[in-house]
Amino acid sequence: MKLRNAEKRLLIAVSQIIENEGFSKIGVNKIAKQAKCDKVLIYRYFSGLEGLLAAWAKDNDFYTLAYQAYSERVTKAESSEDIIKLTQTVLLKQLNFLRTNKLMQELLAWELSGNSTFRSIQNERERNGFKLQEELEKKLGKESKDVRMFITILIASINYIVLTTRQYRIFNGIDFSNPEAWELCKQTIYNRALFENILK
């Protein structure tokens, strides 16, 4: 279904406010003013602020986008080798997406601050991320806590490194202001030996 012009403006307004002022400034009145819309439209089209943010997340949250992009590729994978390569691809995409996407950085930082009352975005991310995980496990023919925890640690590590190095360039003795550090990070994700004992 095509979005109405007002719906598009409201979604764009959310992005603009987050990018320019931070997630803490999000509110119905501010969004409506930024979008040049009556705030009643937020309730009419999205059932309120939570619904608007959930809709926004579908276009801006990595794992919501990743599920749409990769779920079919998981089901078509023919071997554990394919699964390893696909898992590495998704993790590398996550790294690149988060490094270059200020909106996603602001969202995660706000959630981690403990001040976020907007559960809809996190719930949407968890739902889509876990569906992708379930499809991966189904393809491997097993439900493995080791697989799930392994991927969870990698996802969390990527998030934490990117967010931490926004403020502090050195982490565990590695200078992340140096492009070589990020290349090494990518090479580590592509390290076959790291994955094959868990995913095979």
PLM regions: where:
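Amphipathic alpha-helical packing segments from all-alpha helical-bundle domains
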Residues: 65-69, 107-141, 148-149
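N-terminal positioning helix adjacent to the helix-turn-helix/winged-helix DNA-binding module
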Residues: 5-13
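Hydrophobic alpha-helical connector segments
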Residues: 68-100, 144-151
